[in-house]
Swiss-Prot record:
Subunit relationships: Binds to the SNARE core complex containing SNAP25, VAMP2 and STX1A.
UniProt record similarity statement: Belongs to the complexin/synaphin family.
Protein name from the UniProt record: Complexin-3
Start-end of Basic and acidic residues biased regions: 23-33, 74-87
Keyword DNA repair set for record: no
Lipid group attachment sites (S-farnesyl cysteine): C155
Region described as Disordered: spans on this chain: 13-47, 74-99
Pfam families linked to this entry: Synaphin
One GO molecular-function entry: syntaxin binding
Gene that specifies this protein: CPLX3
Keyword 4Fe-4S: no
Length: 158
């Protein structure tokens, strides 16, 4: 009970008195960081090693994501003929140079490319004209072809 009162009120009381008490809590300063966390020295070292490894993995994943984004930006710069950015190139090189885009991003780029190819075609240009009914044009073309085939068959029989 005394421990709980000391932990709850002790810090506030020290702040109030301005730590005039001198060295009454110096015994806690002698503990190592491992003992303060309730671990043995070996456990603490293993814990620190795991923390370092996890940090390295997170940094590697972060670098990979940055490189993927840089690859996407450079793709769009090439696509729209914008000037290249050296920071993007350096991010790609930091990740190992060969960066694959995630499936979703690659799918988006592929869809954009297909749409642009469709717009670049003659039918895509015709479809973009206002007041032009592409469906009726196709129907007329098919009926004309059908009429031509029938007239060609009649001539061939004679």
């Amino acid at each position: 009970m005394a421990f709980m009162v000391k932990t709850m009120v002790g810090g506030q009381l020290k702040n109030l008195t301005g730590s005039l008490g001198g060295g009454e809590d110096k015994g806690d300063g002698d503990k190592s960081a491992a003992e303060a966390q309730g671990m043995s020295r070996e456990e603490y070292e293993e814990y620190q090693k795991q923390l370092v490894e996890e940090k390295m993995e997170r940094d590697a994943q972060f670098t990979q994501r940055k490189a993927e984004r840089a690859t996407l930006r450079s793709h769009f710069r090439d696509k729209y003929r914008l000037p290249k950015n050296e920071t993007d190139e350096s991010q790609i090189q930091m990740a190992g140079g060969d960066v694959e885009l995630p499936r979703e991003l690659a799918k988006m780029i592929e869809e954009d490319t297909e749409e642009e190819e469709e717009r670049a075609s003659v039918l895509g240009q015709l479809a973009s004209l206002p007041g032009l009914d592409l469906g009726s044009l196709k129907d007329k073309a098919h009926s004309t072809l059908g009429d031509l085939k029938q007239s060609a068959e009649k001539c061939h029989i004679m």
